[in-house]
Amino acid sequence: MPQTVYVLNGPNLNLLGLREPEIYGHATLADVERLCAETAARFGLVADCRQSNREGELIDFIHDAHASKAVGIILNAGGYSHTSVALHDALVAVRIPTVEVHVSNIHARESFRHHSFTAKAAFASLCGFGIDGYRLAISGLAAKIGASAQA
């Protein structure tokens, strides 16, 4: 049975492709989910993609990842990255290898976006690669857990 990676997207990411395309590009959340599924499959993994605009539901998804014995989490918590101690604490509690992803370069934007609580609970953080950051995150996670690319 393939191992599962949870790909969790937070507030407003359901609006990818519509919201500020000059910052976030024209790719949609469906494009992100397709990219994640294809990339995970290259490593013999399955991507369980979920999105919520609610902080508590994102925490529930993290708990679900733990309960289902997921091998990793890719997290784009959106604006909650900069404000949510609760998401940080949930990630620390479950001890699942996590990569934080941001479509835009948060360090080249407003100063309130420069700090990330969730990054402190992740083993890696990627930003500014557009949706390709998800592919890079899954590839990095696969290397971390010892999953090899399938022929």
UniProtKB/Swiss-Prot annotation:
GO molecular function: 3-dehydroquinate dehydratase activity
Pathway info: Metabolic intermediate biosynthesis; chorismate biosynthesis; chorismate from D-erythrose 4-phosphate and phosphoenolpyruvate: step 3/7
Domain of life: Bacteria
Record-annotated active site: 24 (proton acceptor), 102 (proton donor)
InterPro entries with a match to the protein in the record: DHquinase_II, DHquinase_II_CS, DHquinase_II_sf
Disulfide bonds listed in the record: none
Residues reported to bind substrate: 76, 82, 89, 103-104, 113
Stored Pfam families: DHquinase_II
Enzyme Commission code(s) on record: 4.2.1.10
Gene Ontology biological-process annotations: amino acid biosynthetic process; aromatic amino acid family biosynthetic process; chorismate biosynthetic process; quinate catabolic process
Keywords: Amino-acid biosynthesis, Aromatic amino acid biosynthesis, Lyase
Xref: PROSITE patterns: DEHYDROQUINASE_II (PS01029)
UniProt KW Lyase keyword: yes
Reaction catalysed by this enzyme: 3-dehydroquinate = 3-dehydroshikimate + H2O
Site residues by UniProt (Transition state stabilizer): 19
Keyword Amino-acid biosynthesis on entry: yes
PANTHER family noted in UniProt: CATABOLIC 3-DEHYDROQUINASE (PTHR21272:SF3)
Complex formation: Homododecamer.
Biological role: Catalyzes a trans-dehydration via an enolate intermediate.
Family of the protein in this entry: Belongs to the type-II 3-dehydroquinase family.
Protein name stated in the entry: 3-dehydroquinate dehydratase
Origin species: Rhodopseudomonas palustris (strain BisB18)
